[in-house]
Amino acid sequence: LQANRQYLFQGSLKPGPELPEEMKQGLPFLGQPDGQGRFPLRYQGRI
């Protein structure tokens, strides 16, 4: 969190075998997975 109340989150999501099938079907909305099966996540905004 910056002094002007802005934030930036960068990370990734790697679905495991325990992830429900319904959630796996929604993963393409996050984009393409990398070579290790991780979906990139990046969010920014102001609180």
From Swiss-Prot:
Transmembrane segments: none annotated. Keywords: Cell inner membrane, Cell membrane, Membrane, Protein transport, Transmembrane, Transport. One of its GO terms (biological process) is protein secretion by the type II secretion system. InterPro entries: T2SS_protein-GspN (IPR022792). It is found in: Cell inner membrane. Coiled coil: none annotated. GO terms for cellular component: plasma membrane; type II protein secretion system complex. Its main location: membrane. Involved in a type II secretion system (T2SS, formerly general secretion pathway, GSP) for the export of proteins. Belongs to the GSP N family. This is Type II secretion system protein N. It comes from Aeromonas salmonicida.
